[in-house]
């Protein structure tokens, strides 16, 4: 409700006085010389009424195919720089309530000095999430065996009045490993999509979406290493102070953000989420009818 008024309030008016209470008051610039505007940087553009917003969105949709997309070959780098691109996903829990968490996470990544060359809100379905996270399933299996072994030993300790033969606990852990892995993997998929994959009955439901993420493409020298250093360890408890996961994560699933671990992973992940697909005309036409 009142989305236009609320956005205008947060963005703020054009002003020569930087008060820091609005986006423009913090990040905008307004300079006059001899009574005339010499420089104006609004920081953010937002619509003032429904009619104007419709016109502006139709302009965006009209030119998004030619002027939008990933900003390749826009930024000039020294010839010796070996460029890398990497993908960051800010996870669904950051969008489940009104907060500045997303902006704070992006601020933290800005410490890398890398450029954002692409940004897109995405909605993962079960099929897409399963493909995206497939590589971690094997790694999960080995982790789960060790975790299961601890749980089995803890559960059996003191509950039996005889000593188990050597290797029995390891055998039980090996037998249960695949079930535990599937259980943990399904928790990740449910978190990213809002849908429990065990409850999906047909292929159509695998395309359904309920949650959203923000996908960001960063570019620069050693982009993958720089982003992952700021991101921190998977488990927030093990992450270094000042990292995204230490400061914004709750557990190994709700840990703030995902980042690609190699150039090949970045390419694969960007392909899966279709980061370069232009959705703007479709979305605008769905709400306002034909663009032209």
Regions found by a protein language model. Give the residues of each.
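Non-catalytic terminal and connector segments of soluble metabolic enzymes
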Residues: 1-292
């Amino acid at each position: 409700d009142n989305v236009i008024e609320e956005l205008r309030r947060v963005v703020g008016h054009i002003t020569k006085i930087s008060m820091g209470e609005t986006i423009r008051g913090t990040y905008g610039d307004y300079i006059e010389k001899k009574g005339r505007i010499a420089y104006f940087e609004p920081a953010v553009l937002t619509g003032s009424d429904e009619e104007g917003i419709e016109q502006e969105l139709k302009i965006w949709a009209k030119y998004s195919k030619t002027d939008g997309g990933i900003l390749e070959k826009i930024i000039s780098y020294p010839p010796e720089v070996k460029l890398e691109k990497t993908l960051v996903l800010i996870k669904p829990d950051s969008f489940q309530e009104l907060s500045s968490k997303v902006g704070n996470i992006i601020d933290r990544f800005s410490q890398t000095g890398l450029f954002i060359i692409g940004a897109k809100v995405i909605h993962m379905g079960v099929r897409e999430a399963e493909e995206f996270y497939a590589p971690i399933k094997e790694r999960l299996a080995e982790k789960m065996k060790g975790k299961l072994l601890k749980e089995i030993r803890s559960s059996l300790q003191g509950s039996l009045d005889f000593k188990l033969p050597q290797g029995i606990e390891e055998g039980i852990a090996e037998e249960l490993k695949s079930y535990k892995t599937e259980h943990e993997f399904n928790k990740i998929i449910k978190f990213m999509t809002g849908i429990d994959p065990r409850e999906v009955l047909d292929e159509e439901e695998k395309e359904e979406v309920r949650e959203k993420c923000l996908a960001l493409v960063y570019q620069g020298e050693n982009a993958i290493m720089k982003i992952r250093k700021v991101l921190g360890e998977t488990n927030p408890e093990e992450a270094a102070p000042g990292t995204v996961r230490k400061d914004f994560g709750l557990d190994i699933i709700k840990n703030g953000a995902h980042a690609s671990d190699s150039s090949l992973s970045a390419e694969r992940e960007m392909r899966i989420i279709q980061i370069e697909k232009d959705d703007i005309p479709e979305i605008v036409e769905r709400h306002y009818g034909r663009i032209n």
